[in-house]
Design a protein with these regions (language model features):
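Interhelical loop/hinge segments that connect adjacent transmembrane helices in multipass membrane
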Residues: 1-4, 8, 177-178, 193-233, ...
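Helix-terminus/linker motif at the lipid-water interface of multi-pass membrane proteins
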Residues: 27-41, 109-112, 230-261, 265, ...
Length: 508
């Protein structure tokens, strides 16, 4: 048991590092994108990325998850048949869909973009999509075989190549969106080439139609949930382009990318580490007490990071896009989008209650409903309110998700959350932001320092208002006493391997 837990932790950590590198490329390249691309170019890039993700999700048929579900280490020969069958089916479906699209690519360029002048982008898009479908299946096979180091090698190789070719095509060759997509094509194709030897050792040339039918029956319903989640997060891109233009979409996408730091570094990292623990302990006597504390602490972290991102968003956007003032308006969207991410984190925790009681159909209903709600609200308010309306819609829909999940979770897995503390976090965070927004509006060194003082003072403000419990203050004191000595850093890191009993320790 302990060996399995250690193995799981090891692979999870390695996968986290690999996945994080793929998220970083867009952030690292932001200064180049904003200096070399117009807002319209950046809008086109965001539009094509969204389109690509939707099509890849549909063509994948949920089979990357199906591979992990149906392949077992008990019968490796059968696993090889399944893997060959899945790859063959994925290639066939991709060709069946993409060949007609390629034939009618001129018409597609009129539908998606601005006609023949963007035909090269459509061509690149139609080549990238099947490569990404194959890559997603390949990475699932690597995870199945627990080759985590090879997984990271491929992901980091892709990241490095994409980064270098982006710089080459954009800075050296003066290319724009076409250069970015060409970089993606080269890096995706390279990953496939690097993984051919591995795949050849994990396949046998035997097609298994009966197993394929079972896998599709299992995996296909997952598509609707995934598409609904994507529609909730991304459908506003299409509506902004339809009602306004690519230029406004570019400004909006920069705001989304910047606020998305919270999702990448806090929410996704938390999900990766928390989920195995939650499923392991949810039936234990003190589990609910643990979960309520986690809700409070996650909300604290989300509000602190959202406040930090919001307070310094104006300075950061101006710094990143200093050569292109057309992007600067993006900072106005960031506080609302950050608040949406706070509720995204909260609704995630609340939604887990449906997993504990095996009522996951409720999750599917909530996601589909909120995706439809987001689309409906955007259709109504984007035209009069512009991109700020899209940001408001995103925030509101995550808030609605949290409310719905709260009522369902209280019905099936009741917990007494610390709402007084959570409300205090929201009120203090919002008031500090409003003070900064209206009093420290100008961008100068003095205001920057005052904002920094506000952030440093925030934990102290919470202390004055009685947010912390006695045991928490004691733990903070112990933590500081232990970690302030740099010489003990290695021992302290090793000591983080806490027992399950520590996680569930009474907070009274």
């Amino acid at each position: 048991m302990l060996d399995n837990i250690k193995q799981t932790a090891k692979h999870t950590l390695i996968y986290s590092i690999g996945n994080l590198s793929t998220k970083l490329i867009g952030l690292i390249l932001l200064p180049i994108y904003t200096s070399k691309l117009t807002t319209g170019d950046y809008g086109i890039l965001a539009y094509l990325e969204t389109t690509s993700l939707f099509i890849i999700t549909i063509l994948s048929f949920g089979l990357p998850t199906g591979i992990l579900r149906f392949c077992t280490s008990d019968n490796k020969e059968k696993d090889k048949e399944i893997i060959f069958t899945v790859f063959t089916f994925a290639l066939a479906i991709s060709l069946l869909v993409l060949v007609p699209l390629f034939i009618f690519r001129l018409q597609l360029s009129h539908i998606l973009l601005e006609g023949p002048k963007d035909l090269a982008l459509i061509n690149l898009l139609l080549v990238i999509i099947p490569l990404e479908v194959i890559n997603s299946l390949t990475l699932s096979v690597i995870r199945l075989r627990e080759k985590s180091k090879f997984y990271v090698f491929l992901v980091v190789s892709k990241f490095t190549l994409a980064l270098l070719f982006n710089i080459y095509f954009i800075v050296e060759k003066g290319m724009k969106v076409e250069g970015i997509m060409l970089s993606q094509l080269i890096s995706s194709a390279t990953v496939i080439l690097l993984s051919l030897w591995f795949l050849s050792r994990n396949m046998v040339l035997r097609f298994h139609p009966k197993l394929l039918k079972e896998m599709i029956a299992y995996s296909f319903p997952l598509i609707f949930s995934m598409i609904s989640s994507m529609a909730l997060a991304m459908s506003d891109r299409y509506i902004i382009e339809y009602f306004i233009d690519f230029s406004e979409l570019g400004v909006y996408s920069l705001g989304v990318k910047f606020a998305g730091l919270i999702n990448v570094f806090i929410i996704q990292s938390f999900q990766l580490g928390y989920l195995p623990i939650a499923f392991k302990i949810y039936n234990q006597p003190d589990a609910k007490k643990f979960f309520t504390k986690i809700m409070t602490y996650l909300t604290l972290v989300l509000i602190v990071t959202s406040l930090a991102v919001s307070l310094f968003s104006k300075e950061a956007i101006i710094l990143i896009a200093r050569k292109n003032p057309d992007f600067w308006r993006a900072f106005l969207l960031i506080p609302v989008l950050c608040l949406g991410h706070v509720f995204k984190g909260i609704q995630y925790l609340l939604s887990l209650s449906m997993h504990y009681v095996k009522k996951t159909k409720i999750n599917a209903f909530v996601v589909v409903f909120c995706a439809a709600l987001n689309i409906g609200i955007n259709l109504v308010i984007v035209k009069p309110l512009g991109i700020f309306g899209a940001a408001l819609s995103t925030f509101f829909c995550y808030f609605v998700m949290a409310v719905i999940y709260y009522f369902y979770s209280q019905k099936y897995y009741r917990m007494n959350y610390e709402w007084s503390r959570i409300i205090l976090l929201f009120l203090t965070g919002i008031l500090l932001f409003l003070f900064s927004h209206y009093v420290l509006e100008e961008v100068n060194m003095l205001n920057l320092l005052l904002k920094l003082v506000l952030m440093i003072a925030y934990p102290g403000i919470l202390y004055v208002l009685g947010f912390y419990h006695k045991v928490e203050l004691e733990r903070i004191g112990q933590f500081w006493k232990k970690w302030k000595k740099i010489s003990n850093l290695r021992e302290n890191i090793l000591s983080l391997q806490q027992s399950e009993d520590t996680l569930l320790k009474d907070y009274d």
